[in-house]
């Protein structure tokens, strides 16, 4: 990821519609799964600037790792302390250390290499019956300028992720798309990008928005979150998987 992107994410992450919406979707799935439990040992693998570690703490004690010292610095600015610098393909933890491993928009990164190595590492550090919650960008045809900034190596379909999870020994509990209602707008934007002039070196989709826009789009994803408690969605901008060791 371009270094400047970490600062941008840290600045907008708590209120930007995409992050706020993904937070609602994540919490809906975990609330439905754990129903009030607050004693889990949790690893956030690829913690970025740390916002997810904050909201995961309602379920237990959260440890975060990231390969980027810059990202970990932003985590410390959030007063997070259970942190380590490590790759998702070589976790510095003993086997069976965690009840839940989360990894949000990490395994798509070209620096990861073979993402299945990370899936094996996640499984190794999970306790028997422990769960993995993954979130990844969907569909290679949705690649755009944003992907160049964040160093996307690949995007996923549910079918591809299902095959990889089964291959690495997981039992799949949920596998769905998310960010479905906004899919047509995103697809139109991606198709139009080659026709539009570049506006500078920074082409990320992550940027401050008007407050009203963040509120409206967060509400849209909040509606999806309620639906996802019990039902899968057939397409979307994001792939979400909940799998068990």
Task: Please give the residue ranges for each predicted region.
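Short N-terminal helix/helix-N-cap motif within the alpha/beta-hydrolase-1
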Residues: 111-115, 144
């Amino acid at each position: 990821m371009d270094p400047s992107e970490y600062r941008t994410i840290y600045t907008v992450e708590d209120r930007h519609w995409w992050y706020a919406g993904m937070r609602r979707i994540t919490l809906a799935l975990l609330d439905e799964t754990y129903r009030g439990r607050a004693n889990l040992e949790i690893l956030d693998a690829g913690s970025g600037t740390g916002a997810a570690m904050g909201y995961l703490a309602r379920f237990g004690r959260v440890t975060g790792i990231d390969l980027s010292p810059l990202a970990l610095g932003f985590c410390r600015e959030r007063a997070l302390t259970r942190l380590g610098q490590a790759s998702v393909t070589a976790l510095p933890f003993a086997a069976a250390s965690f009840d839940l491993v989360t990894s949000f928009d990490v395994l798509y990164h070209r620096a990861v290499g073979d993402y299945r190595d990370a899936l094996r590492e996640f499984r190794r550090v999970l306790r028997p019956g422990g769960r993995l919650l993954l979130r990844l960008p969907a569909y290679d045809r949705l690649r755009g300028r944003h992907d160049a900034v964040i160093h996307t190596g690949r995007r996923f379909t549910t079918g591809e992720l299902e095959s990889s999870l089964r291959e690495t020994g997981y039992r799949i509990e949920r596998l769905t798309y998310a960010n479905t209602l906004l899919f047509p707008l995103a697809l139109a934007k991606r198709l139009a990008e080659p026709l539009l002039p570049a506006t500078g070196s920074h082409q990320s989709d992550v940027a401050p928005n008007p407050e009203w826009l963040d509120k409206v789009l967060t509400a849209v994803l909040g509606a999806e979150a309620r639906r996802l408690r019990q039902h899968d969605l057939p397409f979307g901008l994001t792939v979400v998987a909940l799998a068990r060791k």
